[in-house]
A protein has these predicted regions:
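Acidic/polar loop patches that form or flank catalytic/metal-binding clefts of enzymes
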Residues: 79, 292-295, 342, 356-357, ...
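C-terminal, active-site-flanking charged/polar segments
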Residues: 477-480, 484-509, 513-521, 546, ...
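Short beta-alpha connecting loops at secondary-structure transitions
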Residues: 262-268, 502-509, 520-531
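N-terminal leader/propeptide and maturation segments of large enzyme subunits in energy/redox metabolism
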Residues: 117-133, 291-338, 528-642, 753
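Long, contiguous, secondary-structure-rich segments that constitute the structural scaffold
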Residues: 527-531, 538-597, 601-604, 657, ...
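Extended redox/cofactor-interaction regions of prokaryotic respiratory oxidoreductases
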Residues: 167-253, 276-280, 333, 377-494, ...
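N-terminal export/assembly segments and adjacent metallocofactor-ligating motifs
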Residues: 1-292, 313, 329, 338, ...
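Conserved short loop/turn motifs at secondary-structure junctions
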Residues: 153-162, 334-337, 360-367, 398-400, ...
């Protein structure tokens, strides 16, 4: 039977109108039919493929966008997205989120120009205004705030924190005089903290997956979430068949049988929040049986053995700790992992060199997250997989030009001397530079002062933050709110002024890769089409706002626009005399051999040629990366990898020391942030995760996970992605709660029953799906649905699990405890 476009749409429309046996499936077909044709279908024209960088997730994948310039009206339209074969992260591949990027560009509910609130906050009443009026309004409010000596009360919250845009925002706050630059990417910062505490390098941790022989993952969904599903998927394929005659073994630790767990060689179910105990139990077996890399431990680490000065008491070392406290029997009782499994996995891990252990959000987002990740990294140190092939390394950065320092005038100096609203850098947050999870408490209490204004850059705390999601009235405590979102999300509804950004297919931006690989990779995002609406690059808006404020604030922004800042920063890369413009693998191999022989042969003579080649190929990278000798690899006080984290000294009454002699004693900390005292507080150790609620009243624990097709607020308005089931018992256009069949039978709940998931913090209504791939004491809810705003495709389906997540946090790492909340399940 021949199906025409008109017939297909008529058929799906009839099904939707009938509303019969198909139920919510009927809605799916109708919505997908409409969404497929929502974008403009271009007439005949001139085709071109333009490189850019995807922004649908943090992966930083290079893409090629097919455009068609109409011969009728001369308008260029983007019609398809594929992977860029030159980009080392994607190599011609792209995930479903990347393909759906067109739907961000063509979203019918995009904000089409500046808006001024004309009714009560949250009422949805807006007046369209021009850009001159909008910027004048923002300038007047900020100038008045500064004139009153309240510059420090300005708060900026950023959700996308790579590249020069967060640098620009932080620079604006510094010049203006506010210490309150806050990021919502707290969970992504924990690997940077682990690198800082163990190696003294404040960069994200990267992983040499392809060269590993054994990969042990703790709560890391490499194939569906994580840092870059495309890059990780390519690495996974290489582990399976990249080297003839060699197949790496992959073991996945998680309470839920995820896509990554199903594709691994072995899934190890575990109780939520106990990953650190398991890692230390594995370490016990490796150490007790002498399976560790004795040369690396002796020559490159500090704190493995007990240590201390001749005149002082002995200090506890990692070896004594794990041998005394983490026997497999004790660890099995904590984690639920059988003793035999603990012993076998430890022996496999130590025997298959190189081996790699890595942790993800499932292991990190608990109140014990930092110590858990330190314990996981200790496994890599035991087998010599730190700064080694097949192991971990610090992410290298591209050699961008360093921006000139900001001249702080008197108003800026006074403002920057004030404490932060989120408490970062002091007390319990002494080790972190941003603590977004603590911001609601500061707003609620008005301490240490009340906020005066709030800038929101790709941040949607009314959805992503448990505290804000339950209490959006907190925004009423802020007199003036500006959102730069291109979409009317949950938080933008409470703004006073909306200055909508371009979508990622309409703007210039740098995208340096982080926490994926290791070599420095700098992607260039460029506009592939003209802006469809009266939107403006947020970087341009910030520069114009700064220049309108005048004085020292304007001096800090000498660039005409954000593209001018990009070009100035990229000068450093062009002049570094290393690396290469992205190219085909065989070209890169030739240039790499030249570099190894001591030659660097550029493909450009001027900066303009360099810039044009970047735009033509998609970016720059350095396959070799800068050389890293031991002095560069370990920049700690001891000059070694530190099992005993001397960088935790700020938590104690006095910091521990390690100079030329790495056996100097440390002070026993009296830390309000951690239950442990004495030497244990400086070592990887297991602390039971703090969870709200009585175990008898709330006997289950909730874990949330990110399916491949959902990225919170970034992709909520893209129906192609909502149509993709997430694996397991999922269906499209639906959110659910997964229940182990044994647990469901005990509670009298059947598959597809309507149920309430309740916690001490709140409750959400969902459909129960029975799923045997789940620990019996655990419920699982996908994260990314349940939006109350964001447009017709984002709203009115699913539920936001953050409404039941408690308000606990890992105060040491400054991250919210989004996993392991105590809950109960009752029939609706």
């Amino acid at each position: 039977m021949k199906v025409t476009r008109r017939g297909f749409l008529g058929w799906t429309g009839a099904l939707a109108a009938a509303g019969v046996a198909g139920g919510d499936r009927v809605r799916t077909l109708a919505d997908v039919g409409a969404a497929t044709y929502q974008a403009e279908v271009p007439p005949q024209g001139v085709e071109a493929w333009l490189p850019s960088v995807c922004a649908q997730c943090p992966g930083g994948c290079g893409i090629l966008v097919r455009t068609v310039t109409s011969v009728e009206d001369g308008v260029k339209r983007a019609v398809k997205i594929e992977g860029n074969p030159y980009h080392p992260i994607s190599r011609g591949t792209v995930c479903p989120k990347g393909v759906a990027g067109l739907q961000a560009l063509y979203d019918p509910d995009r904000i089409k120009g500046p808006l001024k609130r004309s009714g009560p906050r949250g009422s949805g009443q807006w007046a369209s205004i021009g850009w001159d009026e909008a910027l004048a309004m923002a300038t007047e409010r900020l100038r008045d705030l500064r004139a009153r000596g309240e510059a420090h009360t300005l708060v900026a919250v950023a959700g996308q924190v790579r590249g020069l845009m967060p640098v620009l925002l932080a620079r604006f706050l510094e010049a203006y005089g506010s210490p309150n630059y806050v990021t919502t990417a707290e969970g992504c910062e924990i690997s940077r903290q682990v690198m800082h505490l163990t190696q003294g390098i404040a960069e994200p941790m990267a992983y040499d997956l392809e060269r590993s022989a054994y990969v042990l993952t703790f709560g890391a969904g490499l194939l569906e979430a994580g840092w870059s599903p495309v890059r990780q998927g390519r690495a996974f394929a290489y582990l399976r068949q990249g080297t003839p005659g060699r197949r790496a073994r992959i073991v996945h630790v998680d309470p839920r049988l995820s896509v990554s767990a199903a594709k691994a060689d072995e899934w190890v179910p575990i109780r939520p929040g106990t990953d650190g105990a398991l890692a230390l139990g594995l370490a016990h077996v490796i150490v007790s049986e002498g399976l560790y890399d004795k040369a690396f431990v002796a020559e490159r680490t500090f704190g493995f053995d007990d240590w201390g000065d001749a005149g002082g008491p002995p200090r506890l070392g990692f070896k004594s700790l794990v041998l005394e406290e983490y026997r497999p029997e004790a660890v099995s009782a904590i984690t639920g992992v059988p003793i035999a499994t603990i012993t076998r996995v430890a022996r496999e891990f130590a025997g298959a060199r190189p081996a790699l252990a890595l942790g993800g959000g499932g292991a990190s987002l608990h109140t014990n997250g930092l110590y858990t990740r330190l314990a996981i990294q200790a496994l890599n140190a035991l087998v010599g997989s730190v700064e080694a092939p097949g192991g971990t390394t610090a992410q290298r950065r591209p050699p961008l030009t360093v921006l000139p320092p900001v001249r702080r005038d008197a108003a800026a100096q006074r403002g920057l001397a004030m404490p932060r609203l989120d408490g970062a850098g002091t007390g319990r947050g002494a080790l972190v530079t941003s603590a977004f999870h603590a911001l609601p408490g500061g707003l609620r209490a008005g301490k240490p002062y009340a906020p005066g204004a709030l800038l929101l850059y790709y941040a949607n705390p009314a959805y992503s933050s448990p505290e804000f999601a339950r209490a959006p009235e907190l925004f009423e405590k802020v007199p003036f709110i500006v959102s730069f979102s291109p979409f009317m999300d949950e938080t933008t509804r409470y703004a006073d002024l909306v200055l909508p950004d371009h979508t990622f297919l309409e703007r210039w931006q740098d995208d340096p890769v982080e926490a994926v690989w290791g070599p420095p990779v700098l992607g260039l995002r460029q506009p592939v089409v003209e802006p469809r609406h009266q939107t403006r690059h947020t970087g341009d808006a910030i520069i114009q706002l700064a220049q309108a404020l005048g004085g020292a604030v304007a001096e800090a922004f000498p660039w005409k626009d954000f593209q001018g800042l990009l070009r100035a920063a990229f000068q450093g890369v062009a002049e570094a005399r290393r690396g290469l413009i992205m190219a085909a693998p065989f070209e890169e191999a030739r240039q790499r051999r030249q570099a190894e022989a001591g030659f660097w042969i550029p493909t450009y003579k001027t900066f303009d040629e360099f810039w044009n080649q970047m735009a033509e190929r998609g970016g720059w990278w350095d396959p070799a990366g800068p050389p890293r000798d031991p002095a560069q690899a370990f920049q700690t006080k001891s000059g070694r990898y530190e099992f005993v984290s001397l960088g935790l000294g700020p938590l104690g009454t006095r910091p521990p020391t390690a100079g030329p002699r790495p056996n100097q004693p440390a002070a026993a900390p009296e830390a309000p942030s951690v239950p442990a005292r004495g030497d244990r507080a400086f070592l990887p150790h297991y602390e039971p995760a703090r969870v709200a609620g009585d175990a008898k009243e709330f006997p289950l624990q909730l874990v949330t996970y990110k399916p491949m097709a959902l990225m919170g607020s970034r992709t909520a308005n893209q129906p192609w992605l909502a149509e993709i089931p997430a694996g397991g018992p999922s269906r499209a256009w639906e959110a659910w709660v997964e229940v182990n069949p044994e647990t469901a039978h005990r509670l009298g709940i059947h598959d597809r029953d309507e149920v309430w998931v309740e916690s001490p913090a709140g409750k959400v209504r969902l459909r129960a799906r029975l799923y045997p791939g789940l620990h019996p004491d655990v419920l699982a809810i996908p994260y990314g649905a349940g939006h109350a705003a964001g447009g017709r495709y984002a709203e009115a389906w699913g539920a936001n699990p953050n409404r039941v997540v408690g308000g606990e946090a890992d105060r040491l790492a400054g991250i919210p405890a989004l996993q392991g909340t105590r809950v109960r399940l009752v029939r609706a």
